[in-house]
């Protein structure tokens, strides 16, 4: 028998749906966000940047091709709960190893389906991102007030690696230190494809320790949470900017690099999450479709004199990328390594390699 469960938002809205996935043994409280991606749900589920969030899939039917571990962007699911209109209980794909329900159970993540995800998405767009509670008991309206105090804290420490490790390339040309704030596997794949040896280090690593590896370049990964919650990382990163070593930041890495250079960040009303976000390259005038997953952005008017705004979002004009003039570094808010998603901006990895080659 299907269990009725409830999604309560901090504004008092309560939606009813049906439970799937792991047993809902206790209430789950998290930030409720939506993604507009039509495919790549396995990559979405295993993206560490969703730590502390419940994710709404705007596409109505999820799970058609099942789940295959080769599609994982990390070792498991980091989000708190999964929300969809309908899930496919009989997936059809030769690569399928399990269905969506079995995967959620394996990862101990509850889900809710058969609720109006279109209404929920429009609500978030109109009122902004809200905290929510997934519960098996019909909630009292007065309990919604308690949700407002929830905040995602210390997020990066929950998704970073615990100790440094090496990923050698068969044909190494460059040595890159990947500073792991919740790195996606496809960042590693893209760097490997460009013959980069990798040393992956935890978020708590100092600048001195990173420099001790004698890297040709430093990659700042994606990750979850408010970038301003990482003052020690920002401080260490500011030291690395003076080293002369090429630096490339993606998503959270982009925000941290901006903060390390004196810029500011702000929380967006409902963020950019999906595989269809248009950006403009102000350097070339070209437009690209990009994959994105972020709730914060670098403030355009806060960029310091050594920073040049390179990419902007064509929907709202927010900062999507910065180039730095006094050291060999650049960063983007979107995901050039997108999987699944558009590959329009993969060339940025080659630009990073070119910076390393010019310095060699």
Q: Which functions belong to the PLM regions below?
A:
Residues 175-180, 290-291, 330-334:
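Active-site-proximal beta-strand elements of phosphoester/diester hydrolases
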Residues 19-20, 59, 292, 323, ...:
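Short clusters of small/polar residues that mark proteolytic maturation junctions
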């Amino acid at each position: 028998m299907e269990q009725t469960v409830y999604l309560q938002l901090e504004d008092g809205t309560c939606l009813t749906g049906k439970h799937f996935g792991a047993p809902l043994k206790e209430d789950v409280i998290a930030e409720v966000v939506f993604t507009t991606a039509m495919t790549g749900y396995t990559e979405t589920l295993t993206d560490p940047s969703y730590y502390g969030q419940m994710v709404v899939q705007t596409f109505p039917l999820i799970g058609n091709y099942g789940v295959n571990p080769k599609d994982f962007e990390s070792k498991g699911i980091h989000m708190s709960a999964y929300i969809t209109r309908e899930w496919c209980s009989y997936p059809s794909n030769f690569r399928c190893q399990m269905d969506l329900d079995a995967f959620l159970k394996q990862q101990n993540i509850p889900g809710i389906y058969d609720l109006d995800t279109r209404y929920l998405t429009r609500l978030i767009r109109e009122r902004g991102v809200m905290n929510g509670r997934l519960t098996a008991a019909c909630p009292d309206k007065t309990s919604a007030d308690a949700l407002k105090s929830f905040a995602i804290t210390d997020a990066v420490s929950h998704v970073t690696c615990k100790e440094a490790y090496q990923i050698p390339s068969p044909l190494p040309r460059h040595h890159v230190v990947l500073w792991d704030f919740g790195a996606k596997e496809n960042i590693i794949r893209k760097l490997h494809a460009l013959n980069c040896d990798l040393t992956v280090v935890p978020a708590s690593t100092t600048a001195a320790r990173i420099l001790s590896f004698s890297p040709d370049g430093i990659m700042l990964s994606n990750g979850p949470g408010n970038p301003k919650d990482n003052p020690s990382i920002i401080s260490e990163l500011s030291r690395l900017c003076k080293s002369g070593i090429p630096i490339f930041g993606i998503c959270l890495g982009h925000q941290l690099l901006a903060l390390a250079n004196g810029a500011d960040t702000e929380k967006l009303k409902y963020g950019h999450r999906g595989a269809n976000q248009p950006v403009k390259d102000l350097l070339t005038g070209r437009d690209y479709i990009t994959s994105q997953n972020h709730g914060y952005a670098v403030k355009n008017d806060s960029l310091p004199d050594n920073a040049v705004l390179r990419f902007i979002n064509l929907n709202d004009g927010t900062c999507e990328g910065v180039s730095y003039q006094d050291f060999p570094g650049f960063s983007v808010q979107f995901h050039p390594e997108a999987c699944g998603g558009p590959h329009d901006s993969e060339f940025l990895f080659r630009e990073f390699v070119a910076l390393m080659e010019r310095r060699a």
